Regions:
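Beta-propeller blade termini
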Residues: 29-38, 78-87, 128-135, 175
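Structural signal for beta-propeller blades
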Residues: 3-6, 52-55, 101-104, 151-154
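Short coil/loop residues immediately preceding or within conserved phosphate-binding loops
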Residues: 28, 50, 77, 100, ...
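Glycine-aliphatic tripeptides that mark coil-to-beta-strand junctions in extracellular
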Residues: 40-42, 89-91, 139-141
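Blade-edge motifs of beta-propeller repeat domains
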Residues: 5-26, 56-76, 107-125, 156-175
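Hydrophobic beta-strand segments that make up the repeating blades of beta-propeller
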Residues: 1, 44-48, 93-97, 143-147
Length: 175
């Protein structure tokens, strides 16, 4: 196993090996880059299976700080999506988990931290991919989850970061 690593883009349209991030034991499955704290610098969120999901913040010098945990610390995360789910203008985090762990939403608090966990799905989904899009034209980002050995689902956002309705498509149990 190896650490995740950053490769730095050069003017000559090539990349050079940059710093390693995260522990060597990491089981990285996905990552996403976004400004999660409103400082106009992108953070890196690394999604790990059977290990902590970690957010790495930039310093004013451009260095990465030690990762802070988002999630339970022992999630089985396969994918991650970011978008404003409750209309407060702050980016929220959606985790797609497997191995019998519930999928989770983390709403961004006013202090740019991620608070309470909101579960979505059955709690025992085997989700492999998650994305956000307004699927019903109401102006709110909905969650689209692709699952293994069960139906894929769209979870409809009520505009407050809650997903009381869903529908299935494709997969094992769709109509």
């Amino acid at each position: 196993r190896q650490q995740s690593r950053i490769y730095l883009g050069q003017k000559e349209k090539k990349f050079i090996r940059g710093p390693a991030i995260g522990p060597v034991i990491q089981n990285t499955r996905n990552l996403i880059v976004a400004d999660l704290d409103g400082d106009k610098k992108p953070e890196i969120l690394i999604a790990n299976r059977r290990a902590a999901n970690l957010i790495y913040n930039h310093t004013t010098k451009g260095d990465l700080l030690k990762g802070r945990i988002i999630g339970s610390g022992a999630d089985s995360t396969i994918d991650v999506a970011i978008g404003d789910l409750n209309g407060d203008g702050l980016p929220d985090v959606v985790l797609a988990n497997r191995d019998g762990q519930p999928n989770a939403i983390y709403l961004n608090n006013d202090n740019r931290q991620f608070g309470n966990t909101i579960a979505y799905g059955t709690g025992k989904d085997n989700t492999r991919s998650v994305t956000l899009a307004d699927m019903n034209g109401d102006g709110h980002l909905d969650i689209i989850a692709a699952n293994v050995a069960q139906s894929n689902r769209v979870f409809f956002n009520n505009g407050k970061g809650a997903f009381p309705k869903s529908t299935s498509f494709g997969g094992a149990q769709s109509p």
